[in-house]
Amino acid sequence: MEKELDKDKKIAVLIDADNVSEKYIKFIIDEISNHGTPTYKRIYGDWTKPNLASWKAVLLNYSITPIQQYSYTTGKNATDAALIIDAMDILYSGRVDGFCIVSSDSDFTRLAARLREAGKYVIGMGEKKTPTPFIAACEKFKYLEVLASSTTESTEPETPETKREVGQTAGAGGAGTNVTEISEAVRTIITEISDDDGWASLGEVGSVLNKRYPDFDTRNYGFHKLTPFLSSLGCFEIRSRKTSNPNVTNKYIRNQQPKVEPEEAAAPRPRKRKPRKKKRAPSSGTPS
């Protein structure tokens, strides 16, 4: 459902060490592999600071190049400036098809917008505290906490009861847009693109939804696929239709239709009772 680059596309991964923990690196690299091939893998920070000492082993394991950037003065973020300059150099080199900016900092909002203006696919990654402007500037945004948790939970079987509970609660106060807003957005999209019978291609619905909500990811709500997530909401009908290829089926979705109750059997009309004829009293006396 989600727009993704081909696996052979080249992506520059630029990481802000000041705003990302080393525990997320594995999940970042794994997620990028779903979108393309990371050709540039750079991380920016002042590596003379003790708080970044724990990064060394991780950077070696994942072949990530650390870029040293001293803090020239207090209150100025030289790391951000170095990352932005490198991103523009890579852009003009013409060697990549997309960028992944990993940070929870809104300072990269304009950079993401500029890269998209140049026709590049931009993926943002950050923690749940990431400001909305940076999220909106990216074509897609992934929450690091969700990437980490979805990997550890992927081996656990999902029961219908679990899905329904997660679908109703996730997103509220957590990662991503509130599930109620997503549900209403899906209803609107279906109305806009459906056929005369109200059915719309599930793939098209997912594509439009991803464009309107850059941070939309079914994993935010405890699901790995769009179909079970939408089914858990209980307000949509989903059907599969066969194609000319027996191995391929297309899925369609429409807003749940009101149930038509069968008409109650008409009650038999009450029979009209004929008025009883009054008996004539016998005449007295003899006829003349």
What are the language-model segments listed below?
Residues 13, 21-24, 28, 51, ...:
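Helical mechanochemical/support elements of P-loop NTPase systems and associated helical scaffolds
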Residues 144-156:
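Long, charge-dense, solvent-exposed interaction surfaces that engage phosphate-rich ligands
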Residues 44, 97-104, 111, 115, ...:
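Acidic beta-strand-to-loop metal/phosphate-binding motif
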Residues 128, 157-288:
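N-terminal regulatory modules in eukaryotic regulatory proteins
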Residues 17, 71-72, 104, 127-128, ...:
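Short, ordered loop/turn segments at secondary-structure junctions
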Residues 74-76, 129-133, 149-151:
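Short gly/pro/ser/thr-enriched loop/turn and capping motifs at secondary-structure boundaries
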Residues 1-86, 91-92, 113, 121:
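Domain-level signal for Mg2+-assisted phosphodiester chemistry and nucleotide/NA-binding surfaces
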Residues 112-146:
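VWA/integrin I-like adhesion module and closely mimicked acidic/polar interface patches used
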